[in-house]
Amino acid sequence: MKYNDLRDFLAQLELRGELKRVDIEVSPHLEMTEICDRLLKQAGPAVLFERPAGHTIPVLGNLFGTPERVALGMGQTSVSALREVGKLLAYLKEPEPPKGLRDAWDKLPILKQVLNMPPRELASAPCQEIVWEGADVDLSKLPIQTCWPGDVASLITWGLTVTRGPHKSRQNLGIYRQQVIAPNKVIMRWLAHRGGALDYRDFCQINPGEPYPVAVALGADPATILGAVTPVPDSLSEYQFAGLLRGAKTEIVKCLTHDLQVPASAEIVLEGYIYPNETALEGPYGDHTGYYNEQETFPVFTIERITMRRDPIYHSTYTGKPPDEPAILGVALNEVFVPLLQKQFTEITDFYLPPEGCSYRLAVVSMKKQYPGHAKRVMFGIWSFLRQFMYTKFIIVTDDDINIRDWKEVIWAITTRVDPVRDTLIVENTPIDYLDFASPVSGLGSKMGLDATNKWPGETSREWGRVIEMDAAVKARVDHLWQQLLF
């Protein structure tokens, strides 16, 4: 199923019983977080708060609160079908010419999808039906959530931040939280390795003292939203990838303030600039780790215009101790990662990011081991392959006889196949998430790899244990008798 815009997606969710409308007054200050948190933990529906206290603009929450809704948003019928999205990304990351007529025919569906990649620019768009400028630019008129009691201020959480670097023709879409500090100002919290921060750094180096154009789109169509959180190859824009997911070109429109282009169907758009040397101390906020983070200085985004659709919807979320919406996104996107990794490392049989690991901090990998030391090669490969895994602190590697999505099997492999000295790899002074207060220095810490594979000659001098297995004929005999037994 493909969706033209967010409203089309919500209409389809409502038909499936996956959207709940709340027509009683609910406050964006803490109450919406508590409701969405309970809904998510029950695998409940998305929720549209139609009467947010003190506001007339409804608030959409828990939109991607189940992996199934993430899959639907990406145009797939099931979570398992997201493997096909991963295969498409793997092909686009390292395309191969057809090996013959049959191979060319097999690749024809992909080539047809590629035709939907270039976005289509419109002269006018729904997202610009209403325009606030000058004194009318006032973020307090939007029902922006305050998520946790210790949060310093209200926080924009689901904005798609649009940037462009001086060396790139394509634009970058990223999701960075934004603390409201004035009617027309927010703090743009982007980490140094993220696309928006890299674009901004490059711009400042070439254009010192110049204001940097930025736009933030709220309530885009699901393909565009999810494109911003998917490991899209650097050569591909999120708008192009959204077109592939949707099966139709992404419609964009030029901002009224500068030349950046935003999703034409977005519900609300913030347009403006980051002015030179304007920074502010951000936080503390409750985060996906389950803790309040430290304060840190980031650039200030000054909003010159706010444009929106008629009767707009404000899309929001919260982050907290898993499970939260980012953790659910991680569960779904895990299926996208598997084919990407398998194309680069054919020995990998499965890859799992447990949601309890705060989306990406712990990864478990199963593999077909081929030589001594192979597990360590896989560890280093994962840490360096995708930007998303640069901050993964722990990697556990097992043989392919272990179901890595079953913690009982993983723990069994660790406790029976690991010697702590021989099989623990420690790498010091590596990039670490700034939110990770466990690291001794902000942004710099260590990583651990655990080799829970069976050991080969050269890795041990002892005879290795053999796994106990019942005789196959006996199992077949008991299968036949089972219905006759009184169990």
Curated annotation (Swiss-Prot):
E.C. code: 4.1.1.98
Residues reported in the UniProt entry to bind prenylated FMN: I175, Y176, R177, R189, W190, L191, R194, G195
Cofactor requirements of the protein: prenylated FMN; Mn(2+)
GO MF terms held by the record: 3-octaprenyl-4-hydroxybenzoate carboxy-lyase activity; metal ion binding
Residues noted as binding Mn(2+) in the record, renumbered to the chain: N172, E238
Active-site residues (renumbered): D287
GO annotation, cellular component aspect: cytosol; plasma membrane
Catalysed reaction equations from the record: a 4-hydroxy-3-(all-trans-polyprenyl)benzoate + H(+) = a 2-(all-trans-polyprenyl)phenol + CO2
Cofactor stoichiometry and binding remark: Binds 1 prenylated FMN per subunit.
Compartments (UniProt record): Cell membrane
Pathway: Cofactor biosynthesis; ubiquinone biosynthesis
Statement: the UniProt record of this protein carries the keyword Manganese: yes
Membrane topology category: Peripheral membrane protein
Keywords of the record: Cell membrane, Decarboxylase, Flavoprotein, FMN, Lyase, Manganese, Membrane, Metal-binding, Ubiquinone biosynthesis
GO aspect biological process, one term: ubiquinone biosynthetic process
Keyword Metal-binding listed: yes
UniProt main location, coarse: membrane
Top enzyme class: lyase
NCBIfam families hit by this protein: PRK10922.1, UbiD family decarboxylase
Quaternary state and interactors: Homohexamer.
HAMAP family, sorted: UbiD
Family, per entry: Belongs to the UbiD family.
Protein name: 3-octaprenyl-4-hydroxybenzoate carboxy-lyase
